[in-house]
Amino acid sequence: MPDNLKLLTKDYFNRHPIKDISAARFEYSMLLHPEVMDIADEVIPELQAKGLSFPDDSAAVAAVEKEDETARLLRMLRKTLPPKANRVLLEKVLPREEEVLPEIQRMILKEFSDSTIENCTRYLVRCRTNCSEWIIQNYNSIREPYARSMLCLVLGFRAGLDAIPFLMQQVEVFETCFPSETFDQGPILALSELKVRFRTV
């Protein structure tokens, strides 16, 4: 599908620009540079020593670390946790893919919580199974536009060039149906990532 890559021209991104601030942009940055959060974890104690205060996430992190039952870990994925606790949780569920992935997929189809969708997005980007085909096949069953936008982002990291027309279509849908929102940024950032992944020197 190399011809699909030719659709992603400079003119296309001028007409559908990447915005400086959006939920998808934040999530994309975290997926692309997860080490940023690790650096933040190292810097926070220094800032605390200088008198700055931050929410204490140690209890949430400890609760995730001591939990070993998959069903309870999955319930935690539905909660809003501090960023560090979320990262610990993701590392615990990734090796349990056979049990966890079907439940993640069920959550995506049923859940409306933004934090749950964000956790599921991070999981799908990093799990061994490439769920691109599943996302496209089940896309119309996902009712929440925010969830759809985030799943488009997953396609940017995991799908092939054959996903480009689908993502371009979603950009048009979001821009038409939700002109005052930034849902279009999910598929736009996905297209940008696909262009980077498959560009030829």
Could you describe each region identified by the protein language model?
Residues 10-16, 23-34, 42-65, 75-79, ...:
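Structural detector for internal amphipathic alpha-helices that build alpha-solenoid repeat scaffolds
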Residues 102-106, 133-138, 162-170, 200-201:
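Short sequence/structural elements of tandem HEAT/ARM alpha-solenoid repeats
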